[in-house]
Amino acid sequence: MDKEYVGFAALPNQLHRKSVKKGFDFTLMVAGESGLGKSTLINSLFLTNLYEDRQVPDASARTAQTLTIERRGVEIEEGGIKVKLTLVDTPGFGDSVDCSDCWLPVVRFIEEQFEQYLRDESGLNRKNIQDSRVHCCLYFISPFGRGLRPLDVAFLRAVHEKVNIIPVIGKADALMPRETQALKQKIRDQLKEEEINIYQFPECDSDEDEEFKKQNEEMKENIPFAVVGSCEVVRDGTRPVRGRRYSWGTVEVENPHHCDFLNLRRMLVQTHLQDLKEVTHDLLYEGYRARCLQSLARPGARDRASRSKLSRQSATEIPLPMLPLADTEKLIREKDEELRRMQEMLEKMQAQMQQSQAQGEQSDVL
């Protein structure tokens, strides 16, 4: 063996083995009005049927229903790599006659996941924290409008500092190519005008592969992604393809000349899944955590925290309900105080043991 070789070059292999053994968690939210192909696209992206048991309400029922939050989980294994995918769906969004504040349940859900993670992170058992935070939100935009509607703007403005947003134009096969490009530019202009932050692709390093750089730039330019979903295999001439057949021809889901499906799947699965998780933790979650800590510094925050109805016993022995931010900080302080008392007790016990041992040695000498 080369005497100059230490072995640090094998560190990436260690990390790879550890990551493969542990597996990966990813939480994806889909939002947007009904009828834009959200369910079909998700099934197409992950080649699974997550909506097998869903019952589709009729038009009258949709206009009367309120927004609900549904979570569905599935484990996907490919090439020995396991991914635990959690899909957060928002049926009923934008379907009511009065859509005022219909986005608030989504905002609360995202914040509740941050709050749960903050409590778990501040607890005693930090090794087995379940990360239920939303790492990405696919927001579906209608191809039949002239850009973002007021409801779209209100929703995106409410969540853009809490989750990675990827705008998607659903059922893009309803548009001609020039119409698609015009709609994309209109949406980009509106996002800039409304100062809405969407997911920003990281800049490539100088030593990155040229093919990856090209793909990264292509994905940036294609935002918002114009997509078509289909799990049906049709024949286009002599070859089978996944797509949709119309009287005027066939739309191929995985043909980059027909839609942006491949770019969306490449970004979500192959190239940027880990970056979406890192941005969620390092930027979005840390921003939420900083706001929690700042709330303690405001006048009256201590008084508001003291009015919490949750006892210490319920805080440590039973699952916690979702609490206001000030109450969450009270629980954190209580846990810190409890840890400090336990440390003091341990130090006293050690001092008593040392004193007893010293007295025993002294009596032996006498």
Swiss-Prot record:
GO terms for biological process: cell division; meiotic metaphase chromosome alignment; spindle assembly involved in female meiosis. Residues 347-366 are annotated as: Disordered. Disulfide bonds: none annotated. Keywords: Cell cycle, Cell division, Cytoplasm, Cytoskeleton, GTP-binding, Nucleotide-binding, Phosphoprotein. SUPFAM superfamilies: P-loop containing nucleoside triphosphate hydrolases. The modification Phosphoserine is found at S206, S247, S306, S314. Residues 349-366 have a biased composition (Low complexity). The modification Phosphothreonine is found at T250. Residues 22-295 form the Septin-type G domain. One of its GO terms (molecular function) is identical protein binding. GTP binds at residues 32-39, 66, 92, 171-179, 229, 244. Residues 89-92 are annotated as: G3 motif. It comes from the Eukaryota. The keyword Metal-binding does not apply. Residues 32-39 are annotated as: G1 motif. CDD domains: CDC_Septin. Residues 170-173 are annotated as: G4 motif. Belongs to the TRAFAC class TrmE-Era-EngA-EngB-Septin-like GTPase superfamily. Septin GTPase family. Septins polymerize into heterooligomeric protein complexes that form filaments, and can associate with cellular membranes, actin filaments and microtubules. GTPase activity is required for filament formation. Interacts with AURKB. This is Septin-1. The lineage of its organism: Eukaryota, Metazoa, Chordata, Craniata, Vertebrata.
